[in-house]
Amino acid sequence: NPKKIILSFEYLGYKFTVSDPYKKFDTNFRIVDVDIATTKANKYKKRISRAFYDFAKTNDWNLLKDRIKFLTGNFQVFNPHINKTKLAGIFYNYPEVQNDAKNLKELDHYLRRIVLAKHGRLAILLRPLLTSKMKRELLINSFIKGHSDKKFIHFSQSRISQIKKCWKY
């Protein structure tokens, strides 16, 4: 029995889906699922794609690895305006998202599809560049794990600038 969705909306980077419970007599409360907003998930997908296109141009393996770790993990960022570091990343930007959220799963599938693709423009560019070992190394990264385990990585401020460079538009 699928849940009957009553309301779905996006607000402040989140997607809220309100539905009736499976069985009416189980509970009087509606179910509220909290996910990353589809617009935000699409932004992550665009960044994943741009990271791979940049790799196809530069062949900088370490930068590609760091970009995927950056997207799927959590990190510290120094904010010069308040002279403090703040936590950011897939968990710290979306702490209210449930670990089994649909868009987190979709981001993992998207990354997997790009890494393992056999057809398409990006696949043609990546095929001669990515070895099986490299693919395995990339597929260790996961949005779900980064969120649920609060996986933390450390980058210098200059490395973060390099990582973000291909996403500027």
Give the role of each language-model region.
Residues N1:
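Active-site palm subdomain of RNA-directed nucleic acid polymerases
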Residues I6-Y169:
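Active-site and adjacent loop segments of nucleotide-processing enzymes
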